[in-house]
């Protein structure tokens, strides 16, 4: 067994000395921008999920460099916000000192894994040189009327001492609203908050999804979160009043089945009635104390009769008005038609309130009990009833979105300060001199009140300008602010130790050259948080002419989780976590990188197995040992080796193009088996093999390249060429895989059928023992592989 510790330390120092990962803005090459979702620097350091994701991008970065691309593959640290601050509080440290120390540790770990980052392009969101542009973008939003202070119902988390955006609130198993960070109770309360009008970009965000090479599930999550609905706003007159109620519906054909109107707790009419009706006021007070927000019809159908009647514009009959807790606040008009025969929520509510239930659409989707429209199919009736109500001036066609404006202020210390001063009339004014730096604050912990920690520093909060005293905004920006644009920040560091100004000619040239990001790799959990917010900011910057692409991220890959040995999500409480750093000492970075890529497809969740890592370390020894055999390098080699080498390259490159990294490793294994059989290799073939190996195991590849006397560095080698003429044959080698594990190959005539291949393997003495159990399933890829799944005993 070779000494991986000595070998890896040797090449780590040489790469550092020679700056092999230094990025150069080479305009003679096509660009390729590959991006990791940057981590927040926790004290725990890198976990296996980090290492898996970063190895994926590292392999693909090295591959594209070898293809001749000018690859930018940067890394940074998302160091502001709740995650970092909560860890700092738990550690009884100041978040500034704590995050800087952790960043140093992260860089040491990342370096040890051999990732090809150029740390001269590294950034952290807590750097005032960086966050002045976070503040600048906010200022542009403010001047465009897309950022404003509003008194709104917010999600308040007393334990965290801050407001949370809708996207940061989860529903637990009991149906209670809890914080994404820590799962603390969340309640509704009214507060003045900064909001960003992401709703102004709802249609643009929706339309932009069509041009993105993202997994369909992520697109659907964003589509559903934006929640576009095309329908009709119908006006109901209130009996004996000049007031009206407007409802939004996508199913106006059910209007003849409306037996009540339900209003949300925040509807203006409900609030007005509550002033004189103690029963309504008591109901609203009770609802405000509840944390339950999930739609569960069997439990959430409480309401109170407002003692008012509305006139159904289709039937001209009077129907009661209720305040009901199942009506979603802030969606549509805060009021819905109660059609209990055709809506589950309405049905539960009507049964509890003993309201009539009228079926107006039969099983054949035709209307009944609907006057002149009875007998029409549902779609036709929708059109004709809409037309009738529009003619009566009781309806208009409209579009609504579920997407809400982004609550952008947090009552915490560790975040970007707002570049805002309030005058004595409480009017906001933009601060032009940036950055507005975050002041030192010894007592930064939240106290449960709505006053942010920065409010305690009155010397900072109060600003004298002439005869006026201004007050700074003492809330800070959310943790998502700095990550909305960090992919631009890396580009602003090219050819500049500082950041190019975001609106400078130099920055725009770099944006034009390197955007969009060609490949973005990160977790699917950010679908309606970071990924949606970043798209919003990018589209705004596109409108401003700062960037020249409509979308920031062209292709997105969501890597699967690395599960514990017990097949469950890793967590300290379950005792199934694995620290990757000691594995470098015991097995080497190359072995861990290879194993994480070989475990399965990129998007799959995979169970950690120690035996798998041990096996990968043994395979590296096989590679090492082969290249240390005597007389293996020949001037010429036999036809089997020529064919095998070119087939290895062809299939490896095909898999790399499809990001099938586990299958590239399979091809390396197949070719190594062939080399042990033929015991011969040309120098060019050796370099070709080591070039592919270097994508996954750069340390050993570099060592073997040097051992053969070739010029360093193999990590700078170009892709070898495939001689396709060699592969034009009537014979193919088909792989046998049993329960997902490579077992060997046999040669067959091209086009051979599945049964012939299966029979040949089953009757071959070399493979017979593998078929001692009944077959559960056989997957055959013609001319390539037969994968046999055996029944477990």
Curated annotation (Swiss-Prot):
Motif ('KMSKS' region): 569-573
PROSITE patterns assigned: AA_TRNA_LIGASE_I
GO MF term (any one): leucine-tRNA ligase activity
Stored SUPFAM superfamilies: Anticodon-binding domain of a subclass of class I aminoacyl-tRNA synthetases (SSF47323), Nucleotidylyl transferase (SSF52374), ValRS/IleRS/LeuRS editing domain (SSF50677)
Residues annotated as binding ATP: 572
Keywords: Aminoacyl-tRNA synthetase, ATP-binding, Cytoplasm, Ligase, Nucleotide-binding, Protein biosynthesis
Keyword Cytoplasm attributed: yes
UniProt GO cellular component terms: cytosol
Catalytic activity entry: tRNA(Leu) + L-leucine + ATP = L-leucyl-tRNA(Leu) + AMP + diphosphate
InterPro entries reported in the protein's UniProt record: aa-tRNA-synth_I_CS, aa-tRNA-synth_Ia, Leu-tRNA-ligase, Leu_tRNA-synth_edit, M/V/L/I-tRNA-synth_anticd-bd, Methionyl/Leucyl_tRNA_Synth, Rossmann-like_a/b/a_fold, tRNAsynth_Ia_anticodon-bd
Sequence motif 'HIGH' region, residues: 39-50
EC annotation from Swiss-Prot or TrEMBL: 6.1.1.4
Protein's cellular compartments: Cytoplasm
EC class name: ligase
GO biological process entries: leucyl-tRNA aminoacylation
Family per similarity comment: Belongs to the class-I aminoacyl-tRNA synthetase family.
NCBIfam families for the chain: leuS_bact
PANTHER family with a match to the protein in the record: LEUCINE--TRNA LIGASE, MITOCHONDRIAL (PTHR43740:SF2), LEUCYL-TRNA SYNTHETASE (PTHR43740)
Protein known as: Leucine--tRNA ligase
The organism's taxonomic lineage, starting at the top: Bacteria, Bacillati, Mycoplasmatota, Mycoplasmoidales, Mycoplasmoidaceae
């Amino acid at each position: 067994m070779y000494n991986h510790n000595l070998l890896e330390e040797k090449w780590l120092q040489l790469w550092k000395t020679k700056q092999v990962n230094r990025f150069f803005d080479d305009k003679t090459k096509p660009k390729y921008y590959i991006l990791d979702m940057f981590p927040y620097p926790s004290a725990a350091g890198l976990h296996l999920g980090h290492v898996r994701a970063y190895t994926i991008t590292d392999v693909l970065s090295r591959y594209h460099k070898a293809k001749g691309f000018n690859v930018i593959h940067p890394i940074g640290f998302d160091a502001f916000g709740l995650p970092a601050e909560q860890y700092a509080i738990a550690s009884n440290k100041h978040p500034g000192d704590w995050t800087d120390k952790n960043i140093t540790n992260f860089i040491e770990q990342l370096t040890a894994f051999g990732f090809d980052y150029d740390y001269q392009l590294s950034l952290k969101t807590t750097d005032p040189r960086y966050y002045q542009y976070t503040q600048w973008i906010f200022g542009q939003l403010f001047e465009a009327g897309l950022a404003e202070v509003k008194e709104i119902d917010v999600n308040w988390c007393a334990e965290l001492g801050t407001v949370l955006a809708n996207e940061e609130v989860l529903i637990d198993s009991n149906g209670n609203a809890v914080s994404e960070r820590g799962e603390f109770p969340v309640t509704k309360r009214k507060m003045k908050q900064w909001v960003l009008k992401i709703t102004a970009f709802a249609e643009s965000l929706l339309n932009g999804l069509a041009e993105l090479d993202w997994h369909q599930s992520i697109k659907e999550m964003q589509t559903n979160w934006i929640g576009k609905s095309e329908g009709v706003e119908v006006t109901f007159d209130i009996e004996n009043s000049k007031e009206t109620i407007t409802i939004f519906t996508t199913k106006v054909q059910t209007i003849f089945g409306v037996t009540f109107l339900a209003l949300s707790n925040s509807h203006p009419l409900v609030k007005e009635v509550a002033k004189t009706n103690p029963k309504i006021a008591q109901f609203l007070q009770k609802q405000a104390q509840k944390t339950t927000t999930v739609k569960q019809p069997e439990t959430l159908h409480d309401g109170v009769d407002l003692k008012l009647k509305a006139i159904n514009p289709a039937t001209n009959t009077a129907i009661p008005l209720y305040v009901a807790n199942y009506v979603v606040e802030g969606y549509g008009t805060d009021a819905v038609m109660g059609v209990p025969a055709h809506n589950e929520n309405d049905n539960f509510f009507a049964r509890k309130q003993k309201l009539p239930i009228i079926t107006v659409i039969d099983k054949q989707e035709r209307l009944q009990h609907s006057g002149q429209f009875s007998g029409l199919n549902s779609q036709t009736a929708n059109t004709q009833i809409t037309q009738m109500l529009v003619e009566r001036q009781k309806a208009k066609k409209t579009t609504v979105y579920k997407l809400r404006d982004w609550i952008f202020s947090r009552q915490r210390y560790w975040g970007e300060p707002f570049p805002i001063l309030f005058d004595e009339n409480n009017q906001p004014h933009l601060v032009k001199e940036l950055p507005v730096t975050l002041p030192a604050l010894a007592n930064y912990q939240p106290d449960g009140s709505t006053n942010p920690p920065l409010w305690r520093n009155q010397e900072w909060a109060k600003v004298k300008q002439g005869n006026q005293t201004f007050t700074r905004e003492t809330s800070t920006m959310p943790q998502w602010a700095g990550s909305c644009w960090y992919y631009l920040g890396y580009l602003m560091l090219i050819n500049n130790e500082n950041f190019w100004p975001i609106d400078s000619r130099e920055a725009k040239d770099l944006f034009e050259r390197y955007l969009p990001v060609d490949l973005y790799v990160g977790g699917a959990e950010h679908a309606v948080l970071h990924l949606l917010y970043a798209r919003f900011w990018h589209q705004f910057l596109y409108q401003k002419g700062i960037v020249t692409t409509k979308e920031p991220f062209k292709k997105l890959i969501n890597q699967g989780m690395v599960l514990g040995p017990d097949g469950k999500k890793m967590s300290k409480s379950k005792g199934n976590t694995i620290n990757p750093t000691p594995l470098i000492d015991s097995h080497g970075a190359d072995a861990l990188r290879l194993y994480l890529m070989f475990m399965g497809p990129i998007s799959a969740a995979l169970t950690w197995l120690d035996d798998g890592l041990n096996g990968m370390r043994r395979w590296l020894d096989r590679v090492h040992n082969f290249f240390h055999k005597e007389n293996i390098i020949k001037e010429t080699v036999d036809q089997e080796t020529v064919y095998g080498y070119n087939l290895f390259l062809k299939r490896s490159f095909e898999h790399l193009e499809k990001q099938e990294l586990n299958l590239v490793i399979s091809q390396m294994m197949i070719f190594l088996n062939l080399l042990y059989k033929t015991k011969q290799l040309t120098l060019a073939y050796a370099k070709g093999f080591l070039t592919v190996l270097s994508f996954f195991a750069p340390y050993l590849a570099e060592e073997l390249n040097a051992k053969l006397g070739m010029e360093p560095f193999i990590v700078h080698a170009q892709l070898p060429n495939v001689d396709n003429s060699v592969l034009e044959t009537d014979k193919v080698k088909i792989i046998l895989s049993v329960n997902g594990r490579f077992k060997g190959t046999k040669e067959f005539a091209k086009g051979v059928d599945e049964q012939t291949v299966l029979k040949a393997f089953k009757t071959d003495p070399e493979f017979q023992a593998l078929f001692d159990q009944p077959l559960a399933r056989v997957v055959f890829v013609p001319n390539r592989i037969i994968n046999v799944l055996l029944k477990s005993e």
